[in-house]
Structures are given as structure tokens and as C-alpha cells.
């Protein structure tokens, strides 16, 4: 028998590609030694990463379970069925498709199933907290459809449901989209359902940012009210990067299945679907509810402390994991603030605020999220410390001594709340 132990297929990453292994180690170190406040990011469990890094990456499986175009799918069929069952249980849905590669892919599949080019859609303006796929002119959704956009009230910086209703009555959209990427308040899905029924529109909820909160019962669920719900599987859900489509009515199921495959994708990523199944299973456990409650409590603590430090927060607070700072209150742009906090190992992102006078490349806002640091074990007291570091840095941008102290405080927080315990093995170990 030929000895294949030295074959390239058996080489470790360190041996096969030390350049990539080294860069992975650097990213691992960054995650461990920086404070992650990007609202769309989180840290998965080791189990999720183990599933995603498994031999399932080798398997092609076009089609749905037991309706594949390839042989040898009996095990990935069982895995995908388990992911579907868990997703339906987690969100109380009648049907689920776990194959979308991303939230954007999930949204595109919904458009393909329900709309024709030129149809009218009603979605939130990107600069008010919407998403690119909700009709932004730079996205395919804004190029293929007639887009009408709504925003928030200028005074309250919250959704004005009567204003949205008037737009719907005027333009008669075929699809109304709710669910956002930078809206810190709760969404009244029942009110959107009422508007959709009044104008005869389909209702899509994109709950990508709040899916984990919905699963835990911390935010109202869109599933009972919407014709279709899309989400990512990372963010507050704490799974792998991927997408998911849910609906409450089996009438739509076949249309959405066909819109995913063959309509907009080829073979599903079965290794990612396995990781989704693991994450759904984790989210079904009681401790995930406690985690999600802490995510919101931490966001509210962060927002309150920053307001005490005289930094304005859009809408005056938050009901979810997002805290959106309006930096006009301290005479600063989001672009500058992003660089300043990055210098002290805090990762966030510049973001437009409602009625922003700055361009999307500059912005007047800084978006923060609490999901990732809550995974590390941060509580309200720790987030008060985080808020003080942010405020000290932004309010003293030229003070080198304060910058050095901020770096020390960030380092101390990272040591007090390690990311993984025990730590992950370096790829170059």
C-alpha cells in the first residue's frame, strides 16, 4: 500500500501555507485584544467553527433534501433537515430555507419569487437606517424596481407609521420592507401588516440585525405578521455568516424554494448549513435567552453612559443591540471618530444618521453594537467602562496621554473578559 502521509492533502495549514496561517493568527490576536463593537459582528462558538471547518466542505448537493442532483447526499440531507427543523422551532415558522449564502441572497430570492422588474417596493432610506438591498440606487434592488423610501421622524428619530401609511396609500407598492441595519428602536410589525393589507402589498421583514433577540423573545417576532422573513445567521444570532428565509404560510414555500435554487444560487454550502444547525441548537437553549437580555441591557447601559458624557444618541436610546451616536454634538464626523477609536483598539464603523448633512463616506455618526462583547461576558458595568474609554478618546483627540490610558484600559478589559477559554490554538503552532 502506498504511503500517502506526505501527500499535500494531509499537510497542515502551517505546513501547506504558512503565509495564510500567519495572517489567520494575526486576525485571531486582533479579535482577542480589541473590543469588537461593530453591530453586525459576533463571535461564534467553537462548535460552530468546528462544523463549518468539517469535511462537509467537500460535498456538492444541488437541490433540496431527498431531491438532489448528485449522489452521496444522505448525510447532508439529514444535516440540512435538522437545520430546517431547528430554524422552524426557533422562530415558530411553518417553513424555512437554510440555503441562502447571505442575507442579501435571501432578500434577492424573495424579490425573485414575488416581484417583476419595475414593480414598486417601499423600504427605508439607507441614510435613515435601511439596508442596501431595500432599494438603494447602488444595489440591484434599486435598479430593477421602482423604489419609494420612507424615513424616521425628524424630531423623534423614530418610525412614523402614519407617514409610512400615507406613502403606501399614495404609491401602492407590491412589497413593503421593514427591518433595518441601523435603527435602534423596536419595530411594530403588526402596524406594518395593517398597512400592507390596506394597500394589498406583500410584507417582508428583514430581521438580520435582531434575529437573535427575536429568537430569545426579547424583541417581537415578525413571523406571525409577515408574508416572508429573511435574516442573516450571524449578528445577534451568533452563528456562521449566512442567510435564512422563513414564512408562516406554506403557500409561498415552493416559490421561495425555487427562487433560491435554481433561481439565484447553485449548490448550497453544506458545511455552513451544518454550522447554522449548530447555532440554531445553541439558540434554543435557555442560556441564549439570558444572553440576549444582557445584549439589550448592555446597549442601554452604553447609550446612557455616553449621553451622560454629552454625546448624543440617535432617538435618545435603544431597544436592541444598536447604539447610534450623533457626533455633531461634539463637532466630529464619523470618519474621524472611527479612526480615533480604532487607534485605541476599539472596532466600530462610521454611519449616517437621519438627515445627515455629510456624505456616506464621511457621515455624522458612529454605529456601535453590544452583541460581540456580551458574548465575551461583558455586563452593564463593563460597558460603562467601554463608554468612558470612547468618550475620553473622542473628546480628547489630540491628547497622547489619554490615548495611552485608553489603550491600557482596553487591554485590561480584554484580559478580564477573554474571548475563548481555553484560547484557540494558533494556526502556526
Swiss-Prot record:
Task: Kindly state which reaction or reactions the protein catalyses.
Answer: (6R)-5,10-methylene-5,6,7,8-tetrahydrofolate + glycine + H2O = (6S)-5,6,7,8-tetrahydrofolate + L-serine
Give the UniProt entry's GO cellular component terms: cytosol
- Where is this chain primarily localised? cytoplasm
**Keywords, A to Z?**
Amino-acid biosynthesis, Cytoplasm, One-carbon metabolism, Pyridoxal phosphate, Transferase
EC category name: transferase
What is an annotated GO biological process for this record, any one? Answer: tetrahydrofolate interconversion
Query: Per the UniProt record, which residue ranges are transmembrane?
Result: none
Which cofactor does this sequence's record say it needs?
Answer: pyridoxal 5'-phosphate
Q: Where is this site: Plays an important role in substrate specificity?
A: 234
Q: Which Pfam families match?
A: SHMT
Q: Report the pathway entry.
A: One-carbon metabolism; tetrahydrofolate interconversion; Amino-acid biosynthesis; glycine biosynthesis; glycine from L-serine: step 1/1
Main function: Catalyzes the reversible interconversion of serine and glycine with tetrahydrofolate (THF) serving as the one-carbon carrier. This reaction serves as the major source of one-carbon groups required for the biosynthesis of purines, thymidylate, methionine, and other important biomolecules. Also exhibits THF-independent aldolase activity toward beta-hydroxyamino acids, producing glycine and aldehydes, via a retro-aldol mechanism.
The record's annotation in PANTHER family points to: SERINE HYDROXYMETHYLTRANSFERASE, SERINE HYDROXYMETHYLTRANSFERASE 1
Give the record's subunit note: Homodimer.
- Its recorded name reads Serine hydroxymethyltransferase
**High-level lineage:** Bacteria, Bacillati, Cyanobacteriota, Cyanophyceae, Synechococcales
Q: Which gene encodes it?
A: glyA
Amino acid at each position: 500500500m502506498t504511503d500517502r502521509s506526505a501527500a499535500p492533502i494531509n499537510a497542515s495549514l502551517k505546513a501547506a501555507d504558512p503565509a495564510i496561517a500567519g495572517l489567520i493568527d494575526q486576525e485571531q490576536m486582533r479579535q482577542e485584544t480589541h473590543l469588537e463593537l461593530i453591530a453586525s459582528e459576533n463571535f461564534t462558538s467553537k462548535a460552530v467553527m468546528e462544523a463549518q471547518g468539517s469535511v462537509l466542505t467537500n460535498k456538492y448537493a444541488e437541490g433540496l433534501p431527498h431531491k438532489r442532483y448528485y449522489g452521496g447526499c444522505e448525510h447532508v440531507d439529514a444535516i440540512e433537515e435538522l437545520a430546517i427543523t431547528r430554524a422552524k422551532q426557533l422562530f415558530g415558522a411553518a417553513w424555512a430555507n437554510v440555503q441562502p449564502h447571505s442575507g442579501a441572497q435571501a432578500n434577492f430570492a424573495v424579490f425573485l419569487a414575488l416581484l417583476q422588474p419595475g414593480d414598486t417596493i417601499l423600504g427605508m432610506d439607507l441614510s435613515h437606517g435601511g439596508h442596501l438591498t431595500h432599494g438603494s440606487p447602488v444595489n440591484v434592488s434599486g435598479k430593477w424596481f421602482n423604489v419609494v423610501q420612507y424615513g424616521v421622524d425628524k424630531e423623534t428619530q423614530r418610525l412614523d407609521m402614519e407617514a409610512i401609511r400615507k406613502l403606501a396609500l399614495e404609491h401602492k407598492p407590491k412589497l413593503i420592507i421593514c427591518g433595518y441595519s441601523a435603527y435602534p428602536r423596536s419595530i411594530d410589525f403588526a402596524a406594518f401588516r395593517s398597512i400592507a393589507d390596506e394597500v394589498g402589498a406583500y410584507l417582508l421583514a428583514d430581521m438580520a440585525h435582531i434575529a437573535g433577540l427575536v429568537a430569545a423573545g426579547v424583541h417581537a417576532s415578525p413571523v406571525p405578521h409577515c408574508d416572508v422573513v429573511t435574516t442573516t445567521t450571524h449578528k445577534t444570532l451568533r452563528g456562521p455568516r449566512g442567510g435564512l428565509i422563513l414564512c408562516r404560510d406554506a403557500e409561498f414555500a415552493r416559490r421561495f424554494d425555487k427562487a433560491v435554487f435554481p433561481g439565484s444560487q447553485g449548490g448550497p454550502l453544506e458545511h455552513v448549513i451544518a454550522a447554522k444547525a449548530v447555532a440554531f441548537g445553541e439558540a434554543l437553549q435557555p442560556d441564549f435567552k439570558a444572553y440576549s437580555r444582557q445584549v439589550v441591557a448592555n446597549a442601554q447601559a452604553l447609550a446612557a453612559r455616553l449621553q451622560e458624557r454629552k454625546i448624543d444618541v440617535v432617538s435618545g436610546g435603544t431597544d436592541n443591540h444598536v447604539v447610534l451616536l450623533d457626533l455633531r454634538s461634539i463637532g466630529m464626523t464619523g470618519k474621524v471618530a472611527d479612526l480615533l477609536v480604532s487607534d485605541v483598539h476599539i472596532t466600530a464603523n462610521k454611519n449616517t444618521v437621519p438627515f445627515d448633512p455629510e456624505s456616506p463616506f464621511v457621515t455624522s455618526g458612529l454605529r456601535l453594537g453590544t452583541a460581540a462583547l456580551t458574548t465575551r461576558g461583558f455586563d452593564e458595568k463593563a460597558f460603562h467602562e467601554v463608554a468612558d474609554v470612547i468618550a475620553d478618546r473622542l473628546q480628547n483627540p489630540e491628547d497622547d496621554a489619554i490615548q495611552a490610558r485608553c489603550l491600557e484600559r482596553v487591554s485590561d478589559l480584554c484580559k478580564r473578559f477573554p474571548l475563548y477559554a481555553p484560547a484557540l490554538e494558533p494556526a502556526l503552532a
